[in-house]
Amino acid sequence: MAAEENTTYQEIYDPFIWDRPTHFNFANDVIDKWASKDKKKPAIFWVDDKGNEKSRTFTDISTHSKKISNALSTSGVERGDVVIVILGREIEWWEIFTAVLRMGAVISPGTTQLSAKDVEYRFNAAKATCIVTNFANAAKVDEIAENCPTLKTKVLIDGSVDGWLNYSDLLTQFSDDFPDIKTAADEESMCYFTSGTTGYPKMTIHNHSYAIAHQVTGPYWLNLGETDLHWNISDTGWAKAAWSSYYGPWTCGATLFIHHGPGFSAAETLSLIEKFPITTMCGAPTIYRMLVLEDLNKYDFTGLRHCVGAGEPLNPEIIGTWKTATGLTIRDGYGQTETGILCGNFHFMEPKFGSMGKPAPGIHLAIIDDAGKEVSTNTEGDIAVKLVPEKPQGLFKEYKNDAERTADTRRGDWYITGDRAYADDEGYFWFVSRADDVILSAGYRIGPFEVESALIEHAAVAESAVVSSPDDTRGEVVKAFIVLAPGYKGSDELSKELQDHVKNVTAPYKYPRKLEFIDALPKTVSGKIRRIELREQEWNS
């Protein structure tokens, strides 16, 4: 499955054809096959911030998931039911994920940062019948349980609470003799709640065939094989965990490195890379921005051979700093909760710093105009995926119970991602902005990413977010919210210096006419900057 290092992009992309089985179940067809191939094959190496270590083989994952499938079935969870899982990076998350897929139910992962109100909304929107969480989150579930009429089963992985089943007891009480459920490839398997710019979070529904899309993610983007130890630094409630902490690595038979702790520490992350034989790594741009603020020369990166980033574009300056210290290029990849990987700097191609890369094998990706026509090179437009003659694997089924918002993602024969970009003469895609993040100032269209990339080249800038701000003359102007690097203080002089810096680095009309120094940027649980929050703050003030 993996490409040889001397293989060219076109040699992989041109002949690629998706597998399209009638039936597919990742638990049966992938997990169990690795387990039968080698009963001791490692699947997970887990550590926490206290130094505790655990491991699981594919046999463990297979056996434990069969027991949990039996337990959930006995407690009333049926095929097609939605099971909400709210856990951090506890090792049980991977066993439960597999168990739910195995029994033909629908898994709906959520972050531990959800409030009781958030949980209530998810239960009632999805008509979920089961919740699996930990002791720390049990109270918020019990607070709203009586408002959730479909809730039948509550499972706790630690501690003891009245009305909850104990996970460890279930592993002891139930057999690992669970029949293979022959799920159809187009049968529902996952439900991710994803926020839009308006309204409640959308229920993004994927089928079992979604997993097949990661036959591209694992070998081609993550560059994984059976002997790799892969670390994806991601919250389990984010779809990126499905990409790079589950389907992608385990498709390739790689071992997952999981670090469970209360929060992110750049210094600790670098120490773990040095201490353990981690070979490949995936992180959000925010992770890399924080890592490069450390003294990278203090650490040994000889075991690390491949790094990727996803979530939003990574600034060229950060990629260059990381490469100087580690010898490795962070290879950006692009996709969404609604898709598998659509575009990337794959290991068999030469990357361009700051580029999204080229279309993924199996994906007809293009830049189109408002009429659904492909535009010429170096012309900005909407990033779109061709749906004919066949829809590519990994593309979501629908936004559940929301036909209007589902329809809004279609333009003729295209799926519209909601992102803007252009493609250069060599076929590399370059991100401009979310369609709703574009700044229109005095007739100019300005993407926030290019301004942020210019700002971060200045030593004083640790992070920035650029949004539109109202202006009587220009209609709107560029405003930059800036988190300063250690040792710098905000001042009028520094503001002027940063404005001049942007004018020198990029087209002068793009410079931020307004700047504000802040302690931290608002972000999603996956580390994406919430520009919409800053933009609304500007326009509503």
Regions found by a protein language model. Name each.
Residues T74-S75, T98, R102-D169, T183, ...:
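Structural core segment of the AMP-binding/adenylate-forming
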Residues K39-P42, L156, D162, T172-F193, ...:
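Conserved pre-ATP/AMP-binding loop-to-beta segment of ANL
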Residues G362, K373-D408, I446:
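Conserved ATP/PPi-binding loop(s) of AMP-dependent carboxylate-activating enzymes
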Residues K54-T59, S189-A213:
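Conserved AMP-binding A3 loop
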Residues L114, Y121, T129-N134, M281, ...:
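AMP-binding/adenylate-forming catalytic core of the ANL superfamily
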Residues I212-N232, T236-T279, E294:
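Conserved AMP-binding/adenylation subdomain of ANL enzymes
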